[in-house]
């Protein structure tokens, strides 16, 4: 049994099926938690599902006897409920064996299409037999898909189309970034750090580089302080209507040096897993750092990576590829 996560229940199931190399009818699904959007980016957590691979012997099989019985029952139901047309009564002196044979043959030929039709109807019914948890999860995945479609439609409706709308959106984003800079400088000042900000601003991104003599205090242990400030900055932009702008905070090229460190960590961890045959849990990381680990080992044919846990304690696991 393995726990998988995703933005929706359906996305979590899809990620699990891809990881396990299984189809939907080969696993049992148990929904552990629904996805929550949170408030202003706080309290948000993904949907969680637990997938259990169903043994091959447990798969339901439809026997020929049961299919034949179902077909015969369907034929009997059709013959009972079908309206009968009145037929004229013809008096004959004697029924010959030839006529009886023809009547019996006609009855048999008429029953064959009905029987085959009943079998054709019964076959999809037997294929639709699945375990209880999977059916329940399918019902829950429909509202998630609908809400995702509505969200995409809402984003498309809010996307500026005319040059005037694009210019207005750009001006609003610049205003939000300026306000964010003032807010961040006030926050770090309370930490005892005097700094300036260099801004690299685009249509959907904003990179803010702190210029200060107290880089270590602003970065924190393993980058925890700068990462917390970055999360706070993203929440600030979301609150000011610029959620589509991705904010990155940097100081003294820390992000570049951290990326190089993570790549070396991924390579050394992969060598350790290959040598020992045991999976290794890395320290908890933010999502953008976990993506660097996944990307670095994606082309390694000996190990595989996946994430476990919930933010902020979600961590990458490196294991032997099966």
From Swiss-Prot:
Residues 256-322 form the R3H domain. Residues 174-251 form the KH domain. GO terms for biological process: cell wall organization; peptidoglycan biosynthetic process; regulation of cell shape. It comes from the Bacteria. GO terms for molecular function: RNA binding. A probable RNA chaperone. Forms a complex with KhpA which binds to cellular RNA and controls its expression. Plays a role in peptidoglycan (PG) homeostasis and cell length regulation. This is RNA-binding protein KhpB. The lineage of its organism: Bacteria, Bacillati, Bacillota, Bacilli, Lactobacillales.
């Amino acid at each position: 049994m393995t726990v998988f996560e995703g933005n929706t229940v359906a996305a979590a199931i899809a990620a699990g099926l891809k990881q396990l190399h299984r189809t939907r009818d080969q696993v049992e699904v148990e929904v552990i938690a629904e996805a929550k959007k949170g408030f202003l980016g706080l309290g948000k957590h993904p949907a969680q599902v637990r997938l259990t691979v169903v043994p091959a012997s447990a798969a339901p099989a439809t026997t020929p006897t049961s299919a034949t019985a179902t077909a015969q029952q369907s034929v009997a139901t059709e013959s009972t409920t079908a309206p009968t047309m009145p037929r004229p009564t013809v008096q004959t002196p004697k029924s010959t064996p030839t006529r009886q044979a023809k009547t019996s043959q006609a009855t048999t030929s008429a029953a064959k299409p009905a029987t085959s039709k009943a079998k054709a109807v019964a076959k999809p019914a037997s294929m639709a037999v699945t375990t209880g948890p999977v059916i329940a999860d399918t019902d829950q995945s429909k509202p998630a898909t609908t809400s995702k479609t509505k969200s995409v439609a809402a984003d498309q409706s809010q996307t500026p189309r005319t040059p005037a709308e694009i210019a207005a959106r750009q001006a609003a984003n610049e205003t939000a970034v300026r306000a964010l800079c003032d807010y961040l400088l006030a926050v770090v000042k309370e930490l005892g750090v005097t700094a300036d900000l260099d801004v690299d601003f685009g249509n959907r991104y904003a990179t803010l580089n702190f210029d200060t003599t107290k880089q270590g205090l602003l970065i924190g242990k393993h980058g925890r302080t700068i990462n917390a400030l970055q999360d706070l900055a993203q929440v600030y932009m979301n609150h000011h209507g610029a959620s589509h702008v991705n904010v990155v905070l940097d100081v003294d090229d820390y992000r570049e040096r951290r990326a190089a460190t993570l790549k070396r960590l991924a390579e050394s961890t992969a060598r350790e897993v290959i040598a020992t045959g045991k999976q290794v849990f890395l320290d908890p990381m933010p999502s953008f750092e976990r993506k660097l680990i996944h990307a670095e080992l994606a082309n390694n044919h000996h190990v595989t990576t996946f994430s476990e846990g919930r933010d902020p304690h979600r961590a990458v696991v490196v294991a032997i590829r099966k």
